[in-house]
Amino acid sequence: MKKILLFLFLILGVYSFSAPSYVDLNKIQRDGYQIDVNDVDTLAFSQEESDMNLVVTMYFTNDGNPQTLRIAFKTMFAPAFGLEYTDEFQTNRAYIQKSFGENRNGIIYGYNIVPKNQKRKGCFLNVFLITEQELPDELLKDIGNTALDEVESYIK
């Protein structure tokens, strides 16, 4: 009996420190993403492809807003990863921030996509694309919409 209670306590403890139940973790993994961080206030998952890498972060807080994420990218995230923030534009759905940097393979381009509106209260998204190609704004707009459609499909 003690072992059963201990087991239940451990299971409940694990669930209390993971993403909210409205996030479909199974679907994320089925779609080929690797879950990198899963705790009470952050879920981060990524997917590496030959031409583009994608990192998605969900923040679970009632204190956030899209402007905070935009500022954090410019002032903290981009510099921390050796990227130089260059420009930003907006679509009807998102803010798209541009950056570039160098790695051992040459120049890389980073595109940070922050939706203007959250699908669910208290859940803020950030989609970061990394590629070796500079992408035109019109293509970034399409990629941004596609990425947001996919990521928002994981939120019930």
Please place each PLM-identified region on the residue numbering.
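A short acidic-to-branched-hydrophobic micro-motif
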Residues: 46-75, 123-130
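N-terminal "mature-domain start" segment
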Residues: 17-47, 79-88, 146-151
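Localized chelating/binding microdomains
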Residues: 18, 60, 71-73, 149, ...
